[in-house]
Amino acid sequence: ASRWAQSARVGSILRAFGPGEKKLADPEADWFFFGGDMSSLPAISVNLEALKASAKGYAVISVPHETDKQSLLHPAGIQLIWVIDSAITKPSLALTEKIRSLKWLEGVPYPWFAGEFEGMRDMRRFFRDEMKIDRKNMYLSCYWKTGTPDEGMKKAKVLDALLDVKNFAAAL
Protein backbone atom coordinates (compact mmCIF):
# COMPACT_ATOMS: atom_id res chain seq x y z
CA ALA A 1 0.00 0.00 0.00
CA SER A 2 2.85 2.40 0.73
CA ARG A 3 4.34 1.96 -2.77
CA TRP A 4 0.93 2.66 -4.28
CA ALA A 5 0.51 5.75 -2.10
CA GLN A 6 3.89 7.15 -3.18
CA SER A 7 2.97 6.92 -6.86
CA ALA A 8 -0.75 7.74 -6.54
CA ARG A 9 -2.11 10.72 -8.40
CA VAL A 10 -5.36 12.61 -8.02
CA GLY A 11 -8.08 10.35 -9.38
CA SER A 12 -6.16 7.09 -8.75
CA ILE A 13 -8.44 4.27 -7.66
CA LEU A 14 -7.83 2.40 -4.44
CA ARG A 15 -9.58 -0.90 -3.95
CA ALA A 16 -9.65 -2.24 -0.41
CA PHE A 17 -10.81 -5.66 0.64
CA GLY A 18 -11.54 -6.83 4.15
CA PRO A 19 -11.70 -10.27 5.62
CA GLY A 20 -13.87 -12.89 3.97
CA GLU A 21 -17.32 -13.92 5.05
CA LYS A 22 -18.02 -14.89 8.66
CA LYS A 23 -17.30 -18.50 9.52
CA LEU A 24 -19.95 -19.22 12.11
CA ALA A 25 -20.22 -22.42 14.10
CA ASP A 26 -23.21 -24.66 13.43
CA PRO A 27 -25.86 -23.39 15.88
CA GLU A 28 -27.43 -26.86 16.06
CA ALA A 29 -24.37 -28.51 17.63
CA ASP A 30 -24.79 -29.98 21.11
CA TRP A 31 -21.79 -28.01 22.34
CA PHE A 32 -18.95 -25.81 21.08
CA PHE A 33 -15.17 -25.83 21.20
CA PHE A 34 -13.63 -22.50 20.10
CA GLY A 35 -9.88 -22.02 20.09
CA GLY A 36 -7.34 -19.62 18.70
CA ASP A 37 -4.72 -16.98 19.27
CA MET A 38 -5.09 -13.19 19.17
CA SER A 39 -5.44 -13.21 15.38
CA SER A 40 -8.72 -15.10 15.72
CA LEU A 41 -10.11 -13.09 18.63
CA PRO A 42 -12.51 -10.98 16.48
CA ALA A 43 -13.91 -14.10 14.78
CA ILE A 44 -14.28 -15.98 18.07
CA SER A 45 -16.04 -12.94 19.55
CA VAL A 46 -18.53 -12.83 16.64
CA ASN A 47 -19.21 -16.55 17.06
CA LEU A 48 -19.76 -16.29 20.80
CA GLU A 49 -22.21 -13.43 20.36
CA ALA A 50 -24.15 -15.42 17.72
CA LEU A 51 -24.71 -18.46 19.96
CA LYS A 52 -28.00 -19.27 21.64
CA ALA A 53 -28.20 -18.33 25.32
CA SER A 54 -28.33 -22.05 26.17
CA ALA A 55 -25.05 -22.88 24.37
CA LYS A 56 -22.34 -24.71 26.28
CA GLY A 57 -18.70 -25.52 25.70
CA TYR A 58 -15.32 -23.82 25.72
CA ALA A 59 -13.58 -20.80 24.22
CA VAL A 60 -9.81 -21.09 24.68
CA ILE A 61 -7.84 -18.04 23.58
CA SER A 62 -4.09 -17.51 23.70
CA VAL A 63 -2.74 -14.01 24.37
CA PRO A 64 0.82 -12.87 25.18
CA HIS A 65 0.01 -10.88 28.34
CA GLU A 66 -2.60 -10.74 31.06
CA THR A 67 -3.44 -7.21 29.87
CA ASP A 68 -4.49 -8.60 26.47
CA LYS A 69 -7.53 -10.35 27.93
CA GLN A 70 -10.80 -8.81 26.79
CA SER A 71 -14.32 -8.79 28.05
CA LEU A 72 -16.28 -10.96 25.61
CA LEU A 73 -20.03 -11.40 25.48
CA HIS A 74 -20.76 -15.12 25.68
CA PRO A 75 -23.45 -17.50 26.92
CA ALA A 76 -23.07 -18.49 30.57
CA GLY A 77 -22.55 -22.12 29.50
CA ILE A 78 -19.42 -21.28 27.52
CA GLN A 79 -16.33 -21.43 29.72
CA LEU A 80 -13.93 -18.67 28.64
CA ILE A 81 -10.31 -19.76 29.18
CA TRP A 82 -7.34 -17.45 28.60
CA VAL A 83 -3.92 -18.99 27.97
CA ILE A 84 -1.13 -16.51 28.72
CA ASP A 85 1.72 -17.37 26.36
CA SER A 86 4.53 -14.90 25.73
CA ALA A 87 5.80 -17.16 22.91
CA ILE A 88 2.92 -15.99 20.72
CA THR A 89 5.17 -15.12 17.73
CA LYS A 90 6.29 -18.72 17.25
CA PRO A 91 4.54 -22.07 17.30
CA SER A 92 3.66 -22.88 20.87
CA LEU A 93 2.05 -25.90 22.41
CA ALA A 94 0.45 -24.00 25.31
CA LEU A 95 -2.83 -23.33 23.46
CA THR A 96 -3.22 -26.74 21.85
CA GLU A 97 -2.17 -28.57 25.03
CA LYS A 98 -4.82 -26.66 27.00
CA ILE A 99 -7.49 -27.58 24.44
CA ARG A 100 -6.47 -31.24 24.52
CA SER A 101 -6.64 -31.27 28.34
CA LEU A 102 -10.27 -30.15 28.62
CA LYS A 103 -13.10 -32.57 29.44
CA TRP A 104 -15.02 -33.78 26.40
CA LEU A 105 -18.70 -32.95 26.91
CA GLU A 106 -21.71 -35.13 26.05
CA GLY A 107 -23.18 -34.94 22.57
CA VAL A 108 -21.86 -33.78 19.21
CA PRO A 109 -19.48 -30.80 19.36
CA TYR A 110 -18.67 -28.17 16.77
CA PRO A 111 -14.92 -27.45 16.95
CA TRP A 112 -13.85 -24.05 15.59
CA PHE A 113 -10.14 -23.18 15.58
CA ALA A 114 -8.11 -20.48 13.85
CA GLY A 115 -4.64 -19.06 14.34
CA GLU A 116 -1.05 -20.06 13.59
CA PHE A 117 -0.47 -22.72 10.89
CA GLU A 118 1.13 -25.41 13.08
CA GLY A 119 -1.53 -24.99 15.76
CA MET A 120 -4.24 -25.42 13.14
CA ARG A 121 -2.60 -28.62 11.88
CA ASP A 122 -2.34 -29.99 15.40
CA MET A 123 -5.99 -29.22 16.10
CA ARG A 124 -7.03 -30.83 12.81
CA ARG A 125 -5.24 -34.04 13.87
CA PHE A 126 -6.84 -33.85 17.31
CA PHE A 127 -10.43 -33.13 16.28
CA ARG A 128 -10.59 -35.16 13.07
CA ASP A 129 -8.16 -38.03 13.60
CA GLU A 130 -8.24 -38.54 17.37
CA MET A 131 -11.76 -37.40 18.30
CA LYS A 132 -13.28 -38.58 14.98
CA ILE A 133 -15.14 -35.36 14.16
CA ASP A 134 -16.21 -35.26 10.51
CA ARG A 135 -14.46 -32.44 8.64
CA LYS A 136 -17.82 -30.96 7.59
CA ASN A 137 -18.71 -30.55 11.28
CA MET A 138 -15.82 -28.25 12.18
CA TYR A 139 -14.02 -25.13 11.05
CA LEU A 140 -10.23 -24.93 11.02
CA SER A 141 -8.13 -22.19 9.47
CA CYS A 142 -4.64 -20.76 9.68
CA TYR A 143 -4.47 -16.98 9.72
CA TRP A 144 -0.65 -16.79 9.79
CA LYS A 145 2.50 -18.93 9.72
CA THR A 146 5.53 -18.29 11.90
CA GLY A 147 8.41 -16.71 9.98
CA THR A 148 6.50 -16.55 6.71
CA PRO A 149 4.98 -13.55 4.94
CA ASP A 150 1.36 -13.73 3.83
CA GLU A 151 2.09 -15.20 0.36
CA GLY A 152 4.27 -17.93 1.87
CA MET A 153 1.54 -18.78 4.35
CA LYS A 154 -1.01 -19.04 1.55
CA LYS A 155 1.28 -21.41 -0.38
CA ALA A 156 1.86 -23.52 2.73
CA LYS A 157 -1.90 -23.66 3.30
CA VAL A 158 -2.52 -24.92 -0.27
CA LEU A 159 0.28 -27.50 -0.04
CA ASP A 160 -0.99 -28.68 3.34
CA ALA A 161 -4.51 -29.10 1.95
CA LEU A 162 -3.17 -31.13 -1.01
CA LEU A 163 -1.10 -33.36 1.27
CA ASP A 164 -4.06 -33.79 3.60
CA VAL A 165 -6.29 -34.93 0.72
CA LYS A 166 -3.55 -37.27 -0.54
CA ASN A 167 -3.11 -38.79 2.95
CA PHE A 168 -6.89 -39.08 3.35
CA ALA A 169 -7.22 -40.87 0.00
CA ALA A 170 -4.34 -43.22 0.84
CA ALA A 171 -6.08 -44.20 4.08
CA LEU A 172 -9.23 -45.33 2.25
What are these regions (language model features)?
Residues A1-L172:
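Extended, composition-driven regions rather than compact fold-specific motifs
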